[in-house]
Amino acid sequence: MSATKLTRREQRARAQHFIDTLEGTAFPNSKRIYLTGTHSGVRVPMREIQLSPTLIGGSKEQPQFEENEAIPVYDTSGPYGDPQIAINVQQGLAKLRQPWIDARGDTEELTVRSSDYTKARLADDGLDELRFSGVLTPKRAKAGRRVTQLHYARQGIITPEMEFIAIRENMGRERIRSEVLRHQHPGMSFGARLPENITAEFVRDEVAAGRAIIPANINHPESEPMIIGRNFLVKVNANIGNSAVTSSIEEEVEKLVWSMRWGADTVMDLSTGRYIHETREWILRNSPVPIGTVPIYQALEKVNGIAEDLTWEAFRDTLLEQAEQGVDYFTIHAGVLLRYVPMTAKRLTGIVSRGGSIMAKWCLSHHQENFLYQHFREICEICAAYDVSLSLGDGLRPGSIQDANDEAQFAELHTLGELTKIAWEYDVQVMIEGPGHVPMQMIRRNMTEELEHCHEAPFYTLGPLTTDIAPGYDHFTSGIGASMIGWFGCAMLCYVTPKEHLGLPNKEDVKQGLITYKIAAHAADLAKGHPGAQIRDNAMSKARFEFRWEDQFNLALDPFTARAYHDETLPQESGKVAHFCSMCGPKFCSMKISQEVRDYAATQTIEMGMADMSENFRARGGEIYLRKEEA
């Protein structure tokens, strides 16, 4: 941690410099590759980690080597991970999906924005210097049409997005030939259906059944298609966003790019401060991953932060504003019903969800039912016109392990299941949000309840945190719960940073949270038995046993930290080829001793074999040639 705290001006200047000098960057000894599909324009990016050869014999002068295969890995960094692509944040990213959207012929450009708030912002000349220059002309579905990936899937249509996802989820494992690398332990999937090869038809079928979603607003053509579902790789979400007291547009764009570099599959913009609209436009136009929001936060800003003054009209205007900007999924707290609020009275920590507390306060002040619940069908109509997925928020999630799995939490969950079926009537894609704070022995029930009552819609959880005693380390406490619930079937994990419960995360906190959650997600994939999940582990273990230090660094989730820790004690170049590390030293390295034992055993086997053959030769009379019947 830096001893010098930057001023707000210095923080903004640093972020501006980051944006101005941004270019595509590969991880050490990695290169960007693209796998193509049958649909036009389907080029799926992956990162391929190049490995050094293994020394297998020979002499010092003429060593013999065996090549090691490059390892392809899932890559969320988009154009920012390709050194061949010129990055210009002022112009935004290329519109990858635009030709696919246009080819379907079911959308139309809007000549006038649907949101009054958007119209007012665009008419305000004072915002010109903050505004993203290349504002997208929004589209919506033509009258009587639905443009969601769920609608297409139910019609039996395999979209380019679905083919893109199938290639991406297979992670290029068909390129791996080594049996050592392909070896994998059987998983325990708890009912998940994990095919050996993921096809576009399998993707379509999972989306059609509601077991998976493809967040892909037609107004976010820059996004690279991805999928959230328990029969696919476990995904990780990162939260960013400014507040009334900290962060700027430049810093949020920097955090966006940083999040994707470290593995965020989606990013939620939780901004609550000034210039929410303008910040979101910059984020969307520069994001290759889906962007989610909590619209009630901005709606609250529009009524000066007074929850009692919220109206359906203000909220509806916010939905239209954000849908036409390109937001891919909305968190909607429509399950916080008036009759559930008293259930939280006996809790130790009450209602801890910001969105949940806003809606609870509105319900109590008006003594009326939650207007998000009352107008849920209208919400679905809006989402169906732009293909905005719904993330049904857990406004009554437990905020302490004492409150875990209580009456209020599961009452809301059951209501979310009812709302899921309504959303599906409109071909709107749905995932369900979950807790929270839950001790380990109570985690699995959350998954089984969700599968049963929410009809196997994808589950998306914040952790859960497994203990409440570690402020400053809640990325650890929640990472434990995240790996468990991911194994049980949770489709996406919302990261927790070291600043959870303490403050707004900075750039380094974002990285720490993401690395922790990429570990949790990968551990869950291994435990479920996701095909190919173990390849990278096998490659790392082989490199470790063969003392290929550079390969160990480069195969790591965080190559820079791995190298830095090694170099703290063995900084010399000779340390990169040494057959030991500073933990045990040269004489007590278990790997080195194991190699010596293996070599000794192999030599002994050869010598014993030769002795057996010699004895057999003498027993047969010492004749060089034997008669045919004796041979």
From Swiss-Prot:
It catalyses: 5-amino-1-(5-phospho-beta-D-ribosyl)imidazole + S-adenosyl-L-methionine = 4-amino-2-methyl-5-(phosphooxymethyl)pyrimidine + CO + 5'-deoxyadenosine + formate + L-methionine + 3 H(+). Its cofactor is [4Fe-4S] cluster. Substrate binds at N239, M268, Y297, H333, S353, R354, G355, D394, G395, L396, R397, E433, Y460. Zn(2+) binds at H437, H501. [4Fe-4S] cluster binds at C581, C584, C589. Pathway: Cofactor biosynthesis; thiamine diphosphate biosynthesis. It holds the Pfam family ThiC-associated. Keywords: 4Fe-4S, Iron, Iron-sulfur, Lyase, Metal-binding, S-adenosyl-L-methionine, Thiamine biosynthesis, Zinc. Its EC number is 4.1.99.17. InterPro entries: ThiC (IPR037509), ThiC-associated_dom (IPR025747), ThiC/Bza_core_dom (IPR038521), ThiC/BzaA/B (IPR002817). GO terms for molecular function: 4 iron, 4 sulfur cluster binding; carbon-carbon lyase activity; zinc ion binding. Binds 1 [4Fe-4S] cluster per subunit. The cluster is coordinated with 3 cysteines and an exchangeable S-adenosyl-L-methionine. The keyword Metal-binding applies. It comes from the Bacteria. GO terms for cellular component: cytosol. This is Phosphomethylpyrimidine synthase. It comes from Shigella boydii serotype 18 (strain CDC 3083-94 / BS512). The lineage of its organism: Bacteria, Pseudomonadati, Pseudomonadota, Gammaproteobacteria, Enterobacterales.
